[in-house]
């Protein structure tokens, strides 16, 4: 394996990133889909193979879709386990054997998500990943294969919607982090996502990590300039925990979920709908088209 121009040398996994993704559109009535995926834990004995395959098949056929990776794509070492492995003085042949197995596993996983190529906003690093002997992580290797941005530990992604036949442009800002916290209740889990808004201004806030799948919405009053003067509008803000594909409870099979008596998760992902719209206002009997905007909705 060689470093790509995009990834460069050894990139610290704890970096914060800023990036832009261009999404073209033809009609202001067509809905675009932002589909986060993460906490897949491919190769874990309790990875839900069938559900993951069904989701990939569904996502492959979804028109005008974009994807963003939320971390923990494969069942690799945790931070503590990686420190333990690094403390062992392995032979070069053992290191190569581990690297070869890791690359093979990454290639297998890439074959399942290769249909996303060209439509991926980027991949976040999680806390489960493999680090090759040259310093590259398994997530960076996937980014190289997909030709997408490595998002590091957290970051901003601005989605620019550009009309194919005019100069009309709109934007959505997404603030993402693999996740922190392990609240047992849905409210506490989603509160952690909402707290992201205390340090960053965005339209959409996303976290994974705790395997929960939940959505929250809020509205904020903002002033905008228009042809008819200053306008008051409500800005939607979306908060989401993005789900998982790892089963927690299976008869006669051990898991940390069973050991800790954690709640089972509703497997799968959230689906975010982004629809370009134009608002018209009336003044003195005439209608004016005010600034275009993106309408945000989400489903489980």
Where do the language-model regions lie?
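Charged, low-complexity C-terminal accessory regions
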Residues: 123-124, 131-133, 137-212, 297-300
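C-terminal accessory extensions appended to soluble enzyme cores
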Residues: 85-93, 246, 260-266, 271-300
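Core catalytic region of metal-dependent phosphoesterases/phosphodiesterases
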Residues: 4, 21-22, 28-32, 37, ...
């Amino acid at each position: 394996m060689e470093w790509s121009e995009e990834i460069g040398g050894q990139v610290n996994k704890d970096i914060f990133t800023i990036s832009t993704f261009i999404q073209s559109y033809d009609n202001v009535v067509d809905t675009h889909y932002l589909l986060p995926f993460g906490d897949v834990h491919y190769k874990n004995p309790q990875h839900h193979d069938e559900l993951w395959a069904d989701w990939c098949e569904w996502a492959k056929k979804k028109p005008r879709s974009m994807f963003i990776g939320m971390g923990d794509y494969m069942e690799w070492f945790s931070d503590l386990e990686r420190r333990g492995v690094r403390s062992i003085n392995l032979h070069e042949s053992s290191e190569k054997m581990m690297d070869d197995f890791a690359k093979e596993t990454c290639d297998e996983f890439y074959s399942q998500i290769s249909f996303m190529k060209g439509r991926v906003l980027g991949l976040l690093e999680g806390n489960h990943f493999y680090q090759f002997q040259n310093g590259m992580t398994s997530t960076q290797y996937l980014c190289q294969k997909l030709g997408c941005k490595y998002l590091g530990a957290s970051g901003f992604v601005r989605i620019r919607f550009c009309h194919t036949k005019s100069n009309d442009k709109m934007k959505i800002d997404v603030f993402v982090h693999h996740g922190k916290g392990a609240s047992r209740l849905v409210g506490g889990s989603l509160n952690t996502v909402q707290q992201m808004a205390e340090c960053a201004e965005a339209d959409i806030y996303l976290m994974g990590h705790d395997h929960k799948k939940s959505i929250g919405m809020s509205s904020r009053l903002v002033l905008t300039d228009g042809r008819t003067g200053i306008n008051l509008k409500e800005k939607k803000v979306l908060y989401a925990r993005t789900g998982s594909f790892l089963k927690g409870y299976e008869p006669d099979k051990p898991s940390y979920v069973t050991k800790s008596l954690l709640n089972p998760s509703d497997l799968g992902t959230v689906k975010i709908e982004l629809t370009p719209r134009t608002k018209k206002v009336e003044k003195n009997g005439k209608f004016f088209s005010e600034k275009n905007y993106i309408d945000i909705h989400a489903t489980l």
